[in-house]
Amino acid sequence: MVSLEDAVIARLESHGERFEVLVDPDLAAEFRREDSDVSVEDVLAVQEVFRDARKGDKASEEAMRKVFETADPLEVTPVILRRGTIQLTAEQRRQMIEDKRLKIINKIAREAINPQNGLPHPPKRIEKAMEEARVHVDPFKTVDEQVNIVLKAIRTKIPIKFEKVRVAIKIPGERAGSAYGVISNFGKITNEEWQNDGSWIAVVEIPGGLQDSFYQKLSELTGGNVETRLIK
């Protein structure tokens, strides 16, 4: 649940009445998506419907029943979020855009590669390409909704594409147990087997941009006792 300090106002005016709720701006934007599984309880900072949230004036039950046919905040809030507007101060909007921009950059850095050499782009290079391409970030759209649009825009500045790579790994048996969960978090284990010498080998499919961090983590987990090979 978002704190009152970080909450923003979602507002709906209908039938001559005004209704406001205090919400988490990111979760409110996510909630408005048709396929969202975000709960209304998580979106709300406080389970109250206001006539004027800044003054703390609550909406009357009579007004809510007239417009929504219910006075339950958990039933009223979804209607306000989907039909109303989310109010942001200039600073809140700036911060939301900056946060969303960084999330987009990090996702692209994790999942994209330079097709010319198969290596990931550093986040700073992606950030610079976005600036040069004059990319607009929408604070109310999710990262997934915007990332392909951004990728298309920055392709005019740098060679880049989303691609998964397959990596073959071999780890001593005594290290396999602790490494398995970490490896699974990086990507999908498509093949695995135990060798006669007790070692564990596997083929893992990971986002291309994660190669460096994947190899580094494997080295840390095994004390450097790991073999890897990029499968073309």
Curated annotation (Swiss-Prot):
| Any GO BP | cytosolic ribosome assembly
What InterPro entries does the record tag this protein with? EFG_III/V (IPR035647), Ribosome_mat_SBDS_CS (IPR018023), Ribosome_mat_SBDS_N_sf (IPR036786), Sdo1/SBDS (IPR002140), Sdo1/SBDS-like (IPR039100), SDO1/SBDS_C (IPR046928), SDO1/SBDS_central (IPR018978), Sdo1/SBDS_central_sf (IPR037188)
NCBIfam families per the UniProt record, alphabetical: RNA_SBDS (TIGR00291)
Q: Which family does it belong to?
A: Belongs to the SDO1/SBDS family.
Per its UniProt record, what PANTHER family does this chain match?
A: RIBOSOME MATURATION PROTEIN SBDS, RIBOSOME MATURATION PROTEIN SDO1 HOMOLOG
Protein name (record):
Ribosome maturation protein SDO1 homolog
